[in-house]
Amino acid sequence: WKLGNKKIAKIVKQKKTGKPYAVIQGVKKGKTTLLARYKHGKKIRKLTCRITVLAAKKATPQKNVAVPSSTASPSQAPNRAPAITLTPVPTATPTPTWVTTWGTAEEKCDVTSNAMPQIALEDSTVRQVIKVTTTGSKIRFRLSNQYGGRDVTIKSMHIAKQVKASNPEINTDTDATVTFEGKENFIIPKGKVIQTDAIDFPVEALENVAISTFFGETPTTNITGHRGARATTYQVSGNQVSANTFSNYKKTTSWFFLADASLLSANGSKAVVCFGDSITDGYGTDATYLGKKPDSYTRWGDYFAKRLKANKGTENVSVINEGIGSNSILGSYPTDAGKDRFNRDLLEHDGVAYCIILFGVNDLDKLQNTDKYNLLLPEYQKMIETCHKNNIKVYGAPILPFGTSSFYSENSEKVRQLINLWMRSSESGVDGIIDFENAVADPANPQNLLAKYTNKDDGIHPYNGYQVMANAIDLNLFQ
């Protein structure tokens, strides 16, 4: 024990029993703070305590005697050291921090496609649902009109908690107005991204939040959004942002203009970005032909978020899904190439501390030679370097097997194996490996997905194995 730099106590053993006890010396009556160092296994730990000296009686100078319990009175032990009470020193109140709790990869979408509503957004209310992955007290949104040919007019925007999945009903007791620079009616300029004001909105991790927006003018083509939401979006005519529920509504499974949502969360909250293609985007989780439905929240990232929340030490880590179906690292289909959107989808969020890269299968479609290896490698290296320059730990996920798919060729498989071999080596510079590959591969034919995880007409997407993938993640990497 020390008082400042002065050693005032020592641990000695009783002669008869061999049990240790503390001897306190030179402590005056009143309150003071002691610092202790002790061994816990092989580690040296520190403990700071506040002590209260109840009496100023001095110990017999010739002998070191044991400290009595805090219930002993000085009169009962006149020759003992003063009785003390040990209480922990109060810790400072943690400072909340902003962390992105939900996000999606923005892409250029056509309003006339099957993935989008068949009526214009103008003069309609669109209720979009997101699942937050952290707990917080305040919320704010980034709204994007990156690809739009004209401004987006927001006449009114409200948020509330969804009552149950696959239903437009909201809990009106939680209804709150979203503003931008204090205004309820605002513009998202063409080609721009804006951040709304922070508003009070207490919410728990894994709750569903409905964002209801009454639109004025909007682009009719090149809408900024995300096609594969895997969650239901509801649309009705007129201003119904605070309506308890909707009738005569249209449905889609896309998001519009929403880039991310951030929460003011507990100190130490962090985010992990999952960067990739349709496998990360959750292809198949809402496919009716596979017997699946929207709003199941069964992408591998969804299972990962649930595991993080249930695990002590990672409960304040959020998951941001930055996957886009059909996207590749090199090619700009159906939107910006992965290499071109990486910085945006990684660095524009709050509190990102980790990144998982599972990307590249769409670059390997029926290759006629192995030249793609030399084109892809520098792009992986740039992504890894970007993470490290921004103090973000990056975990590589080797490309999954696709031997039974239409993408397969001998050269495609050669490039896949070369990339995976490099990624697993120290040369890649990744901070760890997330081994989805071996989690879903067929042990007897490792160039294929295990048959039970995919469809015989697919062979690329392990939509029945997304939970297996999430279970393969070592949560210690995110402590």
Describe these PLM feature segments.
Residues 365, 400-479:
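Catalytic His-Asp segment of secreted/periplasmic serine-dependent ester chemistry enzymes
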Residues 380-388:
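Surface-exposed amphipathic alpha-helices with a cationic face
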